[in-house]
Amino acid sequence: MVAKNAGMPATPADLINVDEVIGKYYDVVPDPNVPEQRVSFGTSGHRGSSLKTSFNEAHIVAITQAIAEYRKKAGVTGPLYIGRDTHALSEPAWKTAIEVLVANGVRVRIDSRDDFTPTPVVSQAILTHNRAADGTQRFTGEGLADGIVVTPSHNPPTDGGFKYDPVTGGPAPADVTNAIADRANELLGDFRNVKRVPFEQAVKSDLVERFDFREHYVADLENVIDFDVIRSSGVRLGIDPLGGASVNYWPLMNEKYNLTIDVVRPQVDPTWSFMTIDHDGKIRMDPSSPYAMKGLVDSLNNGAWDKYDLVGGTDPDADRHGIVCPNWGVMNPNHYIAVCVEYLFGGNRPGWPEGA
């Protein structure tokens, strides 16, 4: 059933208390004997809320220690790329992870601009690092990299998320996440085997390296996107990052490729006070939801379409997108993805081999 306030602007009563959410991250200690308070990996890592004692400092300490132990057993000897999105709990968890990783002797690469990092950007950093000189991907051998993304994706502002990307650059398979979760839950009840140093010490360590995620990612886009076609088309594009990690990537794309993509709402607000309410009565930054996107659609229908031919949206970690069209609104993702697939496999990619 759709909530009565679905699609309506968020009110003060809908907003989180950021100080409370962060405070409980540090102050509340989970009980490993309570199932709801244990580490549990889903399809995209461990998720929860500090307000429900399901995403607290102890969880991240235990998970990160388990990851450090796992990558050592798996022979992953290269750097670990770590990024975070714009949720209130993401920066505290990011700091906690760095404390544990450095204490375990893991070489960590963080954003040189101290900026938010989309999930695809961390994946691309891992894949390019692990690429051989002949262009093939390496999944075994010395010096391979892996990563962590601190994000609960498009979930509400109260939530936190923490996911591990192995050397393949994508989500870890079930056998890996199960092993990490099992070890993390062992540690959750006994921190004697956890290594950790204060953040101020960790971030100054030689093990922490600054890496320009944004420049590295944007520079690689020309290898997969024909920007000449976009420029010559004259199409007027807008993008709404929905207060997420992609917000500062679009201006660099404009600068580097001479584009004119307009960032519709560039603000970052951990309460997401500018959102409209999703179908279940919660604030949720889902660019494929017509309820969550109604604020954007309404502003476009009230005259902003004069500036755009097409507008897109991305969720907080920018691995989910939505498309808004004039006289239609939010498109069904399955519909336009089907059209894209038909186009790509219909002979429009001459560089692709027949067996692709």
Where in this protein do the model-derived segments appear?
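An N-terminal, well-structured beta->alpha segment
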Residues: 2-103, 128, 207-237, 245
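Ferredoxin-reductase
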Residues: 2-15, 75-168
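Phosphate-binding chemistry for phosphorylated carbohydrates and sugar-nucleotides
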Residues: 12-15, 20, 24-27, 107-123, ...
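Flexible hinge/switch segments at interdomain interfaces of large molecular machines
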Residues: 33-43, 195-198, 263-269
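Glycine-centered structural positions embedded in regular secondary structure
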Residues: 64-68, 100, 146-147, 161, ...
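Accessory alpha-helical/coil subdomains and C-terminal extensions
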Residues: 191-195, 255
